[in-house]
Amino acid sequence: VEFPYSDDEKYIELEKRARAELSMPSMRRSRLKKAISMKGLVTAIEAHSGITGLIAEKTVVYSGGGARQFDAMWISSLCDSVMRGKPDIELVDITSRLRTLDDIMDVTTKPVIFDGDTGGLTEHFVYTVRTLERMGVSMVVIEDKTGLKKNSLFGAQAAQTQAEVSDFCEKIRAGKNAQKTADLMICARIESLILEKGMNDALSRARAYTAAGADAVMIHSRKREPDEVFEFAEKF
């Protein structure tokens, strides 16, 4: 709810109370799923610190008599690594990632999508899911890679290994079983197109991952044209 601008003390106090409630984990966690249900298409922008979170929170574009703003924030592992001067190889540990997340959530109210890299070991991912859910995160995205994680933009030029479908499905199932509520969504990011394994492999994995319990899938492409992304969306 956006209250109309007013200098009236009642409105200011009402807005302050509303924003305080929206920042609570139980309120924030469910809002992305509700937004998707209501709008269909939602927009998210990357944030990797308290100040970038505030920029995402407060950016509003007024046009044609209406106002547009971002629906959610994406907490990127790439940007979280780069701002520390570290390579994007899952070097920044989960405790540090969660500290960044907490800094952002402390000063914002928008729903959060957390980039969870590969999710780590299945046994570790279970605890990550529980922590993210408790903090009020709306979605965690994990990619189907194994071994040393490399940035996807390298594609097949860098040695990267895609996880076995059965192993990744087990990780998804373990994460879903660890949840205490239905609010947190697990999104399976598919690297088939990045690793040049073809559309059929991507579609086969997408169906397997959703059958395992994934709430959403993300398809990744390095190409400048969006054709293969659109093709995937149409066929899936």
Q: Model-flagged regions — what are they?
A:
Residues 15-236:
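Alpha/beta enzyme core
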Residues 1-14:
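Extended, hydrophobic interaction surfaces within ordered domains
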